[in-house]
Amino acid sequence: AVNIPFKVKFRCKAAFC
């Protein structure tokens, strides 16, 4: 959630974070 890229940060919320 913090070590992920900025682009993935947005999808991370609905992807796996």
From Swiss-Prot:
Chief localization: secreted
State where the protein is found: Secreted
Query: In Gene Ontology terms, what is a biological process of this protein?
Result: defense response to bacterium
Keyword Disulfide bond on entry: yes
* One GO cellular component term: extracellular region
- The yes or no answer to whether the keyword Secreted is present is yes
Disulfide linkages recorded for this protein, renumbered to the chain, are 12-17
Q: Which UniProt keywords apply?
A: Amphibian defense peptide, Antibiotic, Antimicrobial, Disulfide bond, Secreted
Tissue expr: Expressed by the skin glands.
Q: Which family does it belong to?
A: Belongs to the frog skin active peptide (FSAP) family. Ranatuerin subfamily.
Function, as annotated: Antimicrobial peptide.
Name of this chain's protein: Ranatuerin-2R
Q: Provide the species name.
A: Pelophylax ridibundus
